[in-house]
């Protein structure tokens, strides 16, 4: 026989079972059974947020997988196309800066 008393609290269509136990172990009980599983999402600092970059100009195609681009410093760089990300208008949308996220414009 279980000698602990049980208390029930009805809220709407759900109920919570909280056994009558010592307060020091009550917290660990609540953490283990009642709080949501998973990590709470927090706001990402601006320094870690992905930033919008102006698309690079492709100057020359060396072979089907390698191109020469003009980087943001004005230098020619030989890069693999695997390291390039298609711009939005290459994915079936228009090249319209008015549709750009306002946060991306400010950074």
UniProtKB/Swiss-Prot annotation:
Composition-biased stretches (Polar residues): 80-98
Pfam family, one: SH3_11
Superkingdom of the source species: Viruses
Region listing for Disordered, in residue ranges: 80-107
InterPro entries cross-referenced by the UniProt entry: SH3_11
Protein name: Putative uncharacterized protein S1
Species the sequence originates in: Human spumaretrovirus (SFVcpz(hu))
Species lineage: Viruses, Riboviria, Pararnavirae, Artverviricota, Revtraviricetes
């Amino acid at each position: 026989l279980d000698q602990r008393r049980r208390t029930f609290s009805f809220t709407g269509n759900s109920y919570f079972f909280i056994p009558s136990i010592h307060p020091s172990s009550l917290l660990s009980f609540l953490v283990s059974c009642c709080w949501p599983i998973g990590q709470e999402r927090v706001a990402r600092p601006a320094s870690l947020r992905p930033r919008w970059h102006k698309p690079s100009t492709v100057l020359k195609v060396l072979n089907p997988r390698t191109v020469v681009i003009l980087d943001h410093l004005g230098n020619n760089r030989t890069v693999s196309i695997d390291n390039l990300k298609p711009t939005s208008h290459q994915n079936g949308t228009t090249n319209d800066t008015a549709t750009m996220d306002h946060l991306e414009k400010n950074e």
